[in-house]
Amino acid sequence: MITSPPNEQAGSWLGVFALALAAFIFNTTEFVPIGLLSNIGQSFEMTPAQVGLMLTIYAWVVSLMSLPMMLATRNIERRKLLMFVFGLFVVSHVLSAISPSFAILLVSRVGIAFAHAVFWSVTASLAVRIAPPGKQVQALGLLATGTSLAMVLGIPLGRVLGEALGWRTTFLGIAGIAALVVFLLARALPLLPSQNSGSLRSLPILFKRPRLMAIYLLTAIVVTAHFTAYSYIEPFTQTVSRLSGEMTTILLLVFGGAGIMGSIIFSLFSDRFPNGLLITAIGTLTVCLLMLLPLSGDATALGTLTIIWGMAIMCFGLTLQARVLSLAPDATDVAMALFSGIFNIGIGGGALLGSVVSSHLGVANVGIVGGLLALGGLGLCCFTTHYFGKIQPAAEVQAESK
């Protein structure tokens, strides 16, 4: 007996869960090299700072291709689109696992980045769309939990597997799990015709929304600040803090677990204190980055800082994602494609800046440089919050139509 697809209107936690699991896979593969920089470098006789450029290339391909790929696929039914995306994802990971050179590894990562560009352009809006009525914030929180679990389980387990069996095994394992996720998505998601995806004609309208432009600028600054330090947390903990490989893995676990706590905080307070939550998150992140070096010699203090840091960056990312969706309800996919692209500009910029700092000033200073940049983001956030006052996205959208 053939069963019909789930009913989109009824809302589906299973569908949201499937998207969260897919988010787990995508975030695992984007950031798992952070825990494997040294291992990959040994295979190709490169330094961690040189290998770290693969993070920059990946992120910048995503940033450049998010909008073009979203526009190219805007009329494709979303469930079918996700099947194609994961097909490319799996094939590219197999290529990563058998790469005979760093250049081929980069080519495989570009293929994964193309899949990433499409996935994150549509996923947040899909999660909101298929969530049970009145549960949109919780759906975003569950999606964020998938992201956090990538930090809690994906990256540390990828590091453990890479150290035990080689980094190639890590990428092969990701390909296998992704193949299972494809099956779950096919079973759990309803048919999802493209809806409110927008087009190139949406861009001038979005660019006329100053609140949205401020969010994009803030995203670029703060994400760059964060990844200036986080991209090189493995060499930092091992060379500056003098922690063992096992302790470094535990620290990555702690960071990811804190991200889950951050998503819970977002779910509880985002509706009541949107501005306060955002300012607090950026301020906390700034302090954590600036204190990274001073506290690096005390494992307990460094662990505590890592917990606070993980909560702060998760609250920041979720708050901005929710605001983008609320400020562009008429072109959600275009707006989220821009957000994903700009977020990845920050990831790539942070990885590049961290590489420069590591090479010229020493890896010990990545937190200081990132913290100073985050301080600028905090100033921008305070200014825009005061300037725009209470955010009323619906009123802004209605004003544009007059």
From Swiss-Prot:
HAMAP family: MFS_SotB (MF_00517). Its main location: membrane. Keywords: Cell inner membrane, Cell membrane, Membrane, Sugar transport, Transmembrane, Transmembrane helix, Transport. Belongs to the major facilitator superfamily. SotB (TC 2.A.1.2) family. Disulfide bonds: none annotated. It comes from the Bacteria. This is Probable sugar efflux transporter. It comes from Pseudomonas savastanoi pv. phaseolicola (strain 1448A / Race 6). It is a multi-pass membrane protein. NCBIfam families: PRK03545.1 (NF002921). It is found in: Cell inner membrane. GO terms for cellular component: plasma membrane. Involved in the efflux of sugars. The physiological role may be the reduction of the intracellular concentration of toxic sugars or sugar metabolites. The keyword Cell membrane applies. PROSITE patterns: MFS (PS50850). One of its GO terms (molecular function) is carbohydrate transmembrane transporter activity. The chain crosses the membrane at residues 14-34, 51-71, 84-104, 110-130, 137-157, 171-191, 213-233, 249-269, 276-296, 300-320, 334-354, 361-381. InterPro entries: MFS, MFS_dom, MFS_Efflux_Transporters, MFS_trans_sf, Sugar_effux_transptr_put. The keyword Transport applies.
